[in-house]
Each structure stands twice: as structure tokens, then as C-alpha cells.
A protein has these predicted regions:
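Bacterial N-terminal signal peptides
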Residues: 9-16
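Soluble non-cytosolic domains of exported or imported proteins
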Residues: 49-61, 114-118, 122, 141, ...
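Bacterial N-terminal signal peptides that target proteins for export
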Residues: 1-8
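Boundary at the C-terminal end of the N-terminal hydrophobic targeting segment
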Residues: 19-21
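Acidic/His/Gly-enriched intrinsically disordered linker/tail segments
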Residues: 142-214, 227, 245-248
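Beta/coil-rich, acidic/histidine-enriched accessory regions frequently appended to metallopeptidases
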Residues: 247-323
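Juxtacatalytic substrate-recognition/specificity segment
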Residues: 27-139, 143
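Structural helix-adjacent loops and short alpha-helical linkers that scaffold large soluble proteins
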Residues: 162-171, 224-233, 262-272
Length: 323
């Protein structure tokens, strides 16, 4: 669940359900049918109601994108797939959101969060959680690096492939989590797992946790693609977790993630996890790809773009149909 670093945004998020229920005169209910997807809107204000078509476009695009990724719709608490979702929307000063089974909450604005998130990418982050976090779920907060970091990774990959951000911007945006991770005060002192061990630690180590997890996702996906000639990726890993870890039966932990990667790709990443996820070593981004060179060649040297084909796939600039 994506929470803004600002305490005000966090407070708005915690109070969202009661605020929607308690404010008379601001409710506007609307049900929208989009194919097999049913959205039950609860708008808190006229500004949000006026953007219904925009919200619907992002939500339906996101659901269909992730449905293809996971090869199934999100699951409820009994393990049954669903396509009807309540969406509570309000306009506010800070971006924030929340996801629970059959429920999306969004506080939106026209501003940016940390220079990278707009309300569309934030909403794609929350939609991803209908699968990862709510359909299959972590045992405890020590897996939040995966839960939140991979949601960031896939939100921006989806946004790129769906056309909400440009391919050029996808490369520039990818530099942000790398920078935030490398400048986090806990880097080299606190493992990614310990960074999310409880709510206070998660807040205190926001950039290490969220952006470290995002960097881990980029490195793992790129490495899997490189070592398997693009035959496998994190997509198969996420699908495996969805299929084998429904939250009503069992919850996953770090060892299960390693097992899922091996099942989905045939590769063993125990050493990677020991050093960079459970340990405090800094992930060696430059050993995997040169993001600046990939952007330079994207802009000016099309004949050199083949050198970055796996990275372009990782970020959603190329799709797996463009091999």
C-alpha cells in the first residue's frame, strides 16, 4: 500500500474510509460497466466526479494489463476471482492511495510526488496491489521491499506500455529510484528486509525500502532476461506466486520469493538475496546496465540501441512481442 512520506498524507490515508462515510453532501455514487469490469464509484467532491472518465480509463487499462501479467483476475479473501471494485476518490493536497480486496482508495491532485509519481502512476501502483499484497500476501513486513518495490517497478512499466508516460521519460524516471536508494541514510547499515519490519521502520526508511525494492526488481528482471536470452523475466515469477500462494491458503516469505524465481526462470538467486536483500551490501547497478548510455543511445544513436535491449524490455520500452 503506497503511502506518502508526509505525515499529513499518511493521516489522510488512514482516515479515508471514515471521511468518505462521514461527510454529508459530498457523496456521488456512480456505477460504470467496462466490459467485464464493474466500478462502483464513491466521489467525495465535484472535481473528482468530473474526472470519472479519466479514472475509469486508467483503472480499466491497469486491470487488463495486470490480468494479462498474472493470467487471472484479482482474488478475494476466499480465493475467488472478481471484477467488481469499489473506487473511493477525493481531491486533496497530497497524493495517496490504498488497496484492499475489491476496493481502491485514491486522493489525487495535479501535482507530482517526489518528482516521479502523478495520480495515474499512483493508481497503477494501487491496482497492482489488488494482486500482489491482496491476492497473494507477505507473511510480515520484512517482505515489504518486495511488496512495495515491485509495485513501483510494475506501475511504471505498465504506465510506459499503456502510454501514460513516454519511453524517454521511462529511462529518466528509472534513474530516480537508483539515486534515492544510493543516498538513503540506511544504506549499508540496514537490510532491505529490516527496513520494513514494522510500520515505523517502513516510514523512517521509505526511500531505502521502496526504491531499494524497485532497484532490486530492475536488476533481477534485467539479469533474468540477460541470462535466458529474454525467454524469462520477473513476469513469470509474479505469475507463479499468484498461482501458488493464494492468501487464503498460505503466505509467502523471502525463501518463497527465491523459490518462485527459480521455478519461473530456472535460476538460483540465493547469493543475491543473501548479500543485497538479507544483508547490507549495496546492489551493483553499474555491473548490470548503464542507464545513462541507454538514454543517450535512445535519443541519439538508434544503431546502438541493440546494446540495451534487455533494459528496454525491463522498463517496458520494448514489449516481449518486439524481440
Amino acid at each position: 500500500m503506497f503511502r506518502a512520506y508526509q505525515l499529513l498524507a499518511a493521516a489522510l490515508l488512514i482516515a479515508a474510509s471514515t471521511a468518505f462515510a462521514g461527510e454529508s453532501g459530498v457523496f456521488s455514487h456512480q456505477t460504470v460497466q467496462a466490459g467485464d469490469i464493474t466500478l462502483h464509484y464513491e466521489f467525495a467532491d465535484a472535481q473528482s466526479l468530473a474526472k470519472q472518465r479519466e479514472f475509469t480509463a486508467v483503472i480499466t487499462d491497469g486491470i487488463r494489463y495486470y490480468q494479462q501479467l498474472f493470467a487471472g483476475y484479482p482474488l478475494d479473501l476466499t480465493g475467488k476471482p472478481y471484477t467488481d471494485i469499489t473506487v473511493r476518490v477525493r481531491h486533496g493536497k497530497h497524493l495517496s492511495g490504498e488497496a484492499d480486496p475489491k476496493l481502491l482508495l485514491l486522493t489525487w491532485s495535479d501535482g507530482m510526488m517526489f518528482g516521479i509519481h502523478n495520480w495515474q502512476t499512483l493508481l497503477l501502483h494501487e491496482i497492482f496491489h489488488l494482486w500482489s499484497a491482496e491476492s497473494f500476501r507477505y507473511q510480515n513486513g520484512r517482505e515489504h521491499w518486495f511488496n512495495e518495490g515491485f509495485a513501483e517497478f510494475y506501475a511504471f512499466k505498465a504506465a510506459t506500455q499503456l502510454g501514460y508516460i513516454s519511453k524517454r521519460d521511462a529511462l529518466a524516471i528509472a534513474a530516480q529510484p537508483i539515486g534515492f536508494y544510493h543516498s538513503a541514510t540506511g544504506l549499508g547499515k540496514l537490510s532491505l528486509r529490516d527496513a520494513g519490519k514494522d510500520n515505523q521502520s517502513k516510514l523512517d526508511n521509505y526511500f531505502l525500502l521502496y526504491h531499494g525494492g524497485w532497484v532490486a526488481a530492475m536488476l533481477l528482471d534485467h539479469d533474468i532476461r540477460s541470462r535466458t536470452a529474454n525467454k524469462h523475466s520477473l513476469d513469470t515469477v509474479m505469475r507463479w506466486l499468484y498461482q501458488h500462494y493464494p492468501r487464503n491458503i498460505k503466505l509467502y516469505n523471502n525463501a518463497d520469493i527465491i523459490a518462485a524465481i527459480k521455478a519461473g526462470s530456472g535460476l538460483d538467486y540465493q547469493v543475491f538475496f543473501t548479500r543485497y536483500i538479507e544483508g547490507t551490501d549495496t546492489m551493483p547497478v553499474a555491473q548490470h546496465f548503464d542507464l545513462g548510455k541507454a538514454l543517450w543511445d535512445f535519443e541519439f544513436n538508434p544503431e546502438q540501441q541493440h546494446q540495451h535491449v534487455y533494459l528496454y524490455h525491463t522498463l517496458g520500452i520494448l514489449t516481449d512481442r518486439q524481440l
